[in-house]
Design a protein with these regions (language model features):
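N-terminal secretory signal peptides that target proteins for export/translocation
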Residues: 1-6
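Sec-dependent signal peptide recognition
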Residues: 7-15
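Long, non-catalytic terminal segments
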Residues: 10, 22-26
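N-terminal pre-ligand scaffold of iron-sulfur
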Residues: 25-105, 118-119, 134-146
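Short cysteine/histidine-rich metal-coordination sites, predominantly Zn2+-binding motifs
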Residues: 104-114, 124-137
Length: 146
């Protein structure tokens, strides 16, 4: 009988550890208290001259299409086939006139507090990382959504 109780206790401890270990970085990245979470879906054609910067590895472009993010989306060409998309609003500021991110090479900088965030992983020294969006490449079309 003691053996059965001990097995149940060990199983319970394992379940508790497993559940607590499942806190996802994506949950933290996408539950930013400063940036509203709303749905959108936009497409861009990489063949258009406007998006020529994105045809090359490490290409970066701020797109500001209607409905795409709060202040637009910053797209980053990771390796020619994989792209990252981030909200173009400072992740650690209440949205204001100074909270649109500036592109600086492979970083974006928040003009409000001068904090830099890496486009490679979306992180900087502040509490909240950049809010990321989903990107799917189909031929020369990028679909960006949240």
């Amino acid at each position: 009988m003691k053996f059965l109780k001990m097995r149940k206790l060990i199983a319970l401890i394992i379940v508790i550890i497993a559940v607590s270990a499942c806190s996802s970085d994506d949950t933290r990245r996408n539950r930013n208290p400063f940036i509203p979470n709303y749905s959108f879906n936009v497409e861009i054609n990489l063949n258009l001259p406007l998006y020529s910067d994105l045809r090359y590895v490490n290409g970066v472009k701020h797109i500001n299409l209607a409905g795409a993010g709060l202040n637009g989306v910053i797209l980053y060409n990771r390796d020619g086939n994989n792209f990252s998309a981030y909200e173009a609003t400072c992740p650690n500021q209440i949205p204001s006139t100074c909270s649109v991110l500036d592109i600086d090479g492979l970083y974006v900088v928040c003009p409000c507090d001068n904090v830099s965030y890496s486009l490679i992983d979306g992180y900087g020294p502040a509490e909240w990382p950049l809010v990321s969006y989903r990107v799917v490449k189909n031929g020369d079309i990028l679909s960006i959504s949240n």
